[in-house]
Amino acid sequence: MKIKLVRSVIGRPGNQVKTVQALGLRKIGDSREVSDTPAVRGMVKTVKHLLEVQE
């Protein structure tokens, strides 16, 4: 599963900032290939409004 950060984490609650960092994303436009596990899916669901996801 490929994820890309498309919106800033500035002004977001701390748990959302930490979730984005845990997914390995730092700046807008960063993308990463992540494993498709239930844990990662839950993290993506938490910050889905900040990400672009490709299955």
From Swiss-Prot:
Binds the 5S and 23S rRNAs. GO terms for molecular function: rRNA binding; structural constituent of ribosome. GO terms for cellular component: cytosolic large ribosomal subunit. This is Large ribosomal subunit protein uL30. InterPro entries: Ribo_uL30_ferredoxin-like_sf (IPR036919), Ribosomal_uL30_bac-type (IPR005996), Ribosomal_uL30_ferredoxin-like (IPR016082). Part of the 50S ribosomal subunit. Gene3D superfamilies: Ribosomal protein L30, ferredoxin-like fold domain. GO terms for biological process: translation. The keyword RNA-binding applies. Pfam families: Ribosomal_L30 (PF00327). It comes from the Bacteria. It comes from Deinococcus radiodurans (strain ATCC 13939 / DSM 20539 / JCM 16871 / CCUG 27074 / LMG 4051 / NBRC 15346 / NCIMB 9279 / VKM B-1422 / R1). Belongs to the universal ribosomal protein uL30 family. Keywords: Ribonucleoprotein, Ribosomal protein, RNA-binding, rRNA-binding. NCBIfam families: rpmD_bact (TIGR01308).
